[in-house]
Curated annotation (Swiss-Prot):
Official protein name in the record: Ubiquitin recognition factor in ER-associated degradation protein 1
The keyword Nucleus belongs to this UniProt entry's keyword annotation: yes
Example GO BP: retrograde protein transport, ER to cytosol
Keywords from the UniProt entry: Acetylation, Cytoplasm, Nucleus, Phosphoprotein, Ubl conjugation pathway
Pathway(s) where this gene product acts: Protein degradation; proteasomal ubiquitin-dependent pathway
N-acetylmethionine modification, residue list: 1
PANTHER family: UBIQUITIN FUSION DEGRADATON PROTEIN 1, UBIQUITIN RECOGNITION FACTOR IN ER-ASSOCIATED DEGRADATION PROTEIN 1
Compartments, as annotated in UniProt: Nucleus; Cytoplasm, Cytosol
UniProt gene name: Ufd1
Modified residues (Phosphoserine): 129, 231, 245, 247, 299
UniProt-recorded Gene Ontology molecular function terms: K48-linked polyubiquitin modification-dependent protein binding
Length: 307
């Protein structure tokens, strides 16, 4: 008994309402067509031939359609969704990062099987480069990128495109299973330290000893102007009823303050006033005081003086 296959591609097999077949896989960049399909590279979905849609429509397949991809030569497997059914017969197109996980080359054989996966509740990722820390809000970026994915598999290294740069993330853990569906799910996301990341060394801070007297060298400045520092005189020549004003202050006594540029937040410094007290001056001698209207007057009309 002989069997003939008139097609160059394998015929899909159906076992107990399960889709299972083999395809020659190629990267999305080799997909023929006028439109740029770079959007497929940004997600976790594949492009299958129309015959697969015909077979799947006859089966009692639960939606969304999820598939398990297996490379039997390297014993590597992953999970994915389907984006379109426009590939040539016997061929499927995969994102480049998915082919790297499966260790597949262009034109290699991959086993495609339909599966049902549980909805994800938790996932943990490890960035493969410290450059991922440059992203301001990594959770928001990851949430936006995962909209193009249908499922996650523990151990996979997925690639996301952000700000014209490719970031790779390893799926460290998924719950409740090692392969989960992330379509319409409420999933908690956590991050591991990036691969090759080192904690920055913090400088050792030595406690500064508190000196007995404050150092005023940083507050030295030019001599300031002091208003109303002179002495006054009364018209009647009498002595003022208050104590005499102090002598002019020496240039070194009053100095303009300079801000302390070495001030540290949270540190309180009690500065002692080490300036000497102003000494009182003695009263001026009586003869040395100014007496108003003490001169001689002159008259325009000369009068004889009485003896």
């Amino acid at each position: 008994m002989f069997s003939f296959n008139m097609f160059d591609h394998p015929i899909p097999r159906v076992f107990q309402n399960r889709f299972s077949t083999q395809y020659r896989c190629f990267s999305v960049s080799m997909l023929a067509g006028p439109n740029d399909r770079s959007d497929v590279e940004k997600g976790g979905k594949i492009i299958m031939p129309p015959s697969a849609l015909d077979q799947l429509s006859r089966l009692n397949i639960t939606y969304p359609m999820l598939f398990k991809l297996t490379n039997k030569n390297s014993d590597r497997m992953t999970h994915c969704g389907v984006l379109e059914f426009v590939a040539d017969e016997g061929i499927c197109y995969l994102p480049h990062w998915m082919m790297q996980n499966l260790l597949l080359e262009e034109g290699g054989l991959v086993q495609v099987e339909s599966v049902n996966l549980q909805v994800a509740t938790y996932s943990k990722f490890q960035p493969q480069s410290p450059d991922f820390l440059d992203i301001t809000n990594p959770k928001a970026v990851l949430e936006n990128a995962l909209r193009n994915f249908a499922c996650l598999t523990t151990g996979d290294v997925i690639a996301i495109n952000y700000n014209e740069k490719i970031y790779e993330l390893r799926v460290m853990e998924t719950k409740p299973d090692k392969a989960v569906s992330i379509i319409e799910c409420d999933m908690n996301v956590d991050f591991d330290a990036p691969l090759g990341y080192k904690e920055p060394e913090r400088p050792v801070q030595h406690e500064e000893s508190i000196e007995g007297e404050a150092d005023h060298s940083g507050y030295a400045g030019e001599v300031g102007f002091r208003a109303f520092s002179g002495s006054g005189n009364r018209l009647d020549g009498k002595k003022k009823g208050v104590e005499p004003s102090p002598s002019p202050i020496k240039p070194g006594d009053i100095k303009r303050g300079i801000p302390n540029y070495e001030f540290k937040l949270g540190k309180i410094t009690f500065i002692r006033n080490s300036r000497p007290l102003v000494k009182k001056v003695e009263e001026d001698e009586a003869g040395g005081r100014f007496i108003a209207f003490s001169g001689e007057g002159q008259s325009l009309r000369k009068k004889g003086r009485k003896p």
